[in-house]
Amino acid sequence: MFHQIWAALLYLYGILLNSIYQCPEHSQLTTGGVDGKEFPEPHLGQWYFIAGAAPTKEELATFDPVDNIVFNMAAGSVPMQLQLRATIRTKNGLCVPRKWIYRLSEGNTDLRTEGRPDMKTKLFSSTCPGGIMLKETGQGYQRFLLYNRSPHPPEKCVEEFQSLTSCLDFKAFLLTPRNQEACELSSN
């Protein structure tokens, strides 16, 4: 009898704690009002990769050699398509160009990477001015990534991102050093 009462009290205590300490909600961005011919203007242009979070360090390992990454997001050549170009500055100073195409899903900003059917990307708003968050999932990994219009956003932005992702049980955290100058983006 005592064990049943104790279990019930612990259960109620858990419910109470869960209701008090819930993770803050971040709304997923949508294409609301867009006629399918272009992506919402505020999200096009240049972005800097600031930080990442994942359940394990292995899911962030691809970013270990990175000092900084600068991206350019542009409307694609066909409706519901985005073209991304990036230049990665490695910690040893090399510049590595990359480009890929995202396909938008109708009515929201779920992105599918062309040539990688297992990869899914969702865009989320950020409380940080000039910021955006992405959640990438694929075969064997999931991670949140923080981007900003500035290569050096306020420290509070990074702290809020880390707090949010930690609350979601993403315990591994990576902050890009951004010690070197960003590489120039190629125009093609």
Swiss-Prot record:
Ranges that cross the membrane: none
Any single biological process term in GO: cholesterol efflux
Localization: Secreted
GO cellular component labels: discoidal high-density lipoprotein particle; high-density lipoprotein particle; low-density lipoprotein particle; spherical high-density lipoprotein particle; very-low-density lipoprotein particle
Family annotation (Pfam families): ApoM (PF11032)
Family: Belongs to the calycin superfamily. Lipocalin family. Highly divergent.
Name this protein carries in UniProt: Apolipoprotein M
